[in-house]
UniProtKB/Swiss-Prot annotation:
Protein's name in the database: Ribosome-recycling factor
Cited function: Responsible for the release of ribosomes from messenger RNA at the termination of protein biosynthesis. May increase the efficiency of translation by recycling ribosomes from one round of translation to another.
Cysteines paired by S-S bonds: none
Location in the cell: Cytoplasm
Assigned protein family: Belongs to the RRF family.
Gene name of the encoded protein: frr
Domain of life: Bacteria
InterPro entries tied to this protein: Ribosome_recyc_fac (IPR002661), Ribosome_recyc_fac_dom (IPR023584), RRF_sf (IPR036191)
Claim: Cytoplasm is one of the keywords in the record: yes
GO CC, any one term: cytoplasm
Example GO molecular function: ribosomal large subunit binding
Alphabetical UniProt keywords: Cytoplasm, Protein biosynthesis
Annotated Pfam families: RRF
Keyword Metal-binding: no
Amino acid sequence: MSVREVYQKIEPRMKKTIEAFQHEIASIRTGKATTALLDRVKVEAYGQQMPLKQVGNISVLDVHTLIVQIWDKSMVSATERAIRDANLGLNPAADGQNIRVSIPPLTEERRKEFVKLTKKFGEDSKVSLRNLRRDMIQEIEKLEKSKAISEDDKNKGKKDADEMLHKFEKQLTELIVHKEKEIMEV
């Protein structure tokens, strides 16, 4: 194994960390209606917990309203209850086979809570990135100990690991700042 192979093994894992962070913050309310708000909602359907996406179609009606079109009419009340119980501060209202979900404006206090949550998710992701960098450096050091690479290659590999970490941390910081602006926008 070479330093390049170690790099190629770790880089996709760092990308996945960024993608996971993006998915995580997509469900944080910003005051605007997005279908991602309901991604984590689970509905008690047919004797099991199912993601909301599997019992109906979610779409944005306007800036402050989502519409959930339920495929099975018997699931309307369970879906409405699941949205209400998801602790998202949303108020669903059944309308035939559809559920209208009004997105109330966020209070200043709630916005600050969401910013804090975004920063927490960001810090957790940064820790994951640093752990991946550590793993990369450990693998490079093992290669050097087994004489598979030279000391110069080891040092270059460590430098590459630091640069890769810096690149992904910068990307993460930009995502955090963007989400904070989105949340604080009134």
